[in-house]
Amino acid sequence: MTITIIAPPQADAAAPAPGNRPGVAHIDPNMKLVTGTFCSASEDWFEEPLERGLRLILVQSGQLRCRIPGQPEHLIEGPSLCTIANDGDFTSAQIYGTDKPLRYTIVQLGVEALDSRLGWLPEQLIRRPGGDPRIMSCPAPRAMQALASQIATCQMLGPTRDLYLGGKALELAALSAQFLSGEGRPVEEPRITCSEVERIHAARDLLVGALQEPPSLDTLASRVGMNPRKLTAGFRKVFGASVFGYLQEYRLREAHRMLCDEEANVSTVAYRVGYSPAHFSIAFRKRYGISPSEIR
C-alpha cells in the first residue's frame, strides 16, 4: 500500500491551542491515521462533517459525548473503541470532558470497508443504503491500547517513521476487524446488571484514587458490595482487563502522561503511581518499548 504523507504545518501557521497536540496524519486513497492529545476548556458542542467510510476511534484516556443523526447520544470514556460507519453527507457533534486530556488514535477507512460481503462488520454497522450513520462503542482490548501507545511514542524520524506508522495503522485496522467480527472476543461474556456496572465504576474510582496504596481485591469488592469473582468478571466485561490489569495499565498511562506533560522526574513519577523506580522502569519499558528516562 502506497502512503502519501501530509506535509507538516508551516512555521507561520497558526499554533494549536495550549495543551492541544494534533498528531501527524498518513493518507492513501483508502486509509488515514491521526493521533494526538486534545485538552478542552469549553463545554460547548463542536460540529464537524462526518467522512464517508468506516472510522475507528480508539480513545485511550479522557472522555467525550458524541451525537450523530438517527442515533442516541454516546458517552465514550477511554479506553474504548468507537466505530462509526457512514456513507452519506452527515454532521457529527462532540463535547469533550474538561477534567483530563483526551488521548486518541483514529484510523479512517474508505467506503469499501462498509461492504457487508467482507463479513467482519457486526449487524449494527452494516450499510443500509440511504440510511443514517451507524455507531457502536465497546471497551478497547489491551492489544489495541498497546498499539496506540506504540504509535504515540514512536521515536523514528523521516521515511522510517512514515513506514512504521503506516504499518501500525494497518495493524490497528486489522485488530479492529478481528475484534468487531467476534474473533477477538471471548465465546461467553459475563452478564452484568446496570446496578453492577455502577458498582464496577465505583470500584474503578476507588482504585485509581489510591494508586500509591491500592486496596486489595477482597477489600475493594467488599467496599462496593460485590464478591471478588464477580468484580473481576465485571471489570473484564466493562474495562477489558482484570482489576490488577486495569490498575497496572492505568498507572503506566498516568505515568506516561506525567512524563510528557509535567516537570516531575522519573523517580517522583514512579512513586506517585505506586511503583519503586526500579520496578517502574521495567514495567514502563515492557509496556511502551522505551525507558521512562527517554521521555523525560
Curated annotation (Swiss-Prot):
Induction trigger: Expression is iron regulated.
Coiled coil stretches, renumbered: none
InterPro entries: Homeodomain-like_sf, HTH_AraC, HTH_AraC-typ_CS, PchR_regulatory_protein
Keyword terms of this UniProt record: Activator, DNA-binding, Transcription, Transcription regulation
Source organism, top-level taxon: Bacteria
A Pfam family matched in the record: HTH_18
Domain HTH araC/xylS-type stretches: 201-296
One Gene Ontology term of the molecular function aspect: DNA-binding transcription activator activity
GO cellular component: protein-DNA complex
UniProt DNA-binding region: 218-239, 266-288
Classification via PANTHER family: REGULATORY PROTEIN PCHR
Role, per record: Positive activator of the genes for pyochelin and ferripyochelin receptors.
Protein known as: Regulatory protein PchR
Protein source organism: Pseudomonas aeruginosa (strain ATCC 15692 / DSM 22644 / CIP 104116 / JCM 14847 / LMG 12228 / 1C / PRS 101 / PAO1)
Gene that encodes the chain: pchR
